[in-house]
Amino acid sequence: NDSSQIAIPILGTVRGGPLRFAQEEWLGQELVPLEETVGGEYFYLEVIGDSMTGARIYPSDLVYVKRCSMVNSGTIAVVLVNDEANLKRVFFKGSTMVLHSENPKYEDMVFSAQEIEAKDIQIIGEVLHSKIRFK
């Protein structure tokens, strides 16, 4: 057992495509260097869908997520939209939030300050990196 690594859970799946529910379910775990787990709560999600292929995130890849409720504009994040988990690049333009797919076949999703305040939109975490899985 290598004490310089820690097991991080794969909690479920996240859509990198059309809006659909992503179930939180234990899918296993991956080892991560201990220094990548400092100062926060971390988890992996398995990507389903092709909306983030332009960012080199493909179906079956694992995204490593740091749980947080805010991200900087331009960050790739896991965002709940009406209880459905989505993997998108997040932009803030004035009082609106834009969820952008890195695949031209998907349109941006734009949300008003009112929709965000109503808690229909919630940032779950920032994607720190992805891990290729060949399935």
Where are these regions (language model features)?
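Hydrophobic beta-strand signal
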Residues: 64-65, 78
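Structural motif
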Residues: 60-62, 75
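Short, Lys/Arg- and Gly-enriched loop/turn segments at beta-strand edges
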Residues: 71-78
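PDZ-domain C-terminal substructure recognizer with occasional recognition of PDZ-binding tails
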Residues: 89-105, 110
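Flexible glycine-/small-residue-rich
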Residues: 12-14, 81, 101
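Short, positionally conserved secondary-structure boundary motifs
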Residues: 1-58, 85, 92-96, 117-121, ...
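Short aromatic-glycine motifs in intrinsically disordered, low-complexity regions
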Residues: 78-80, 107-118
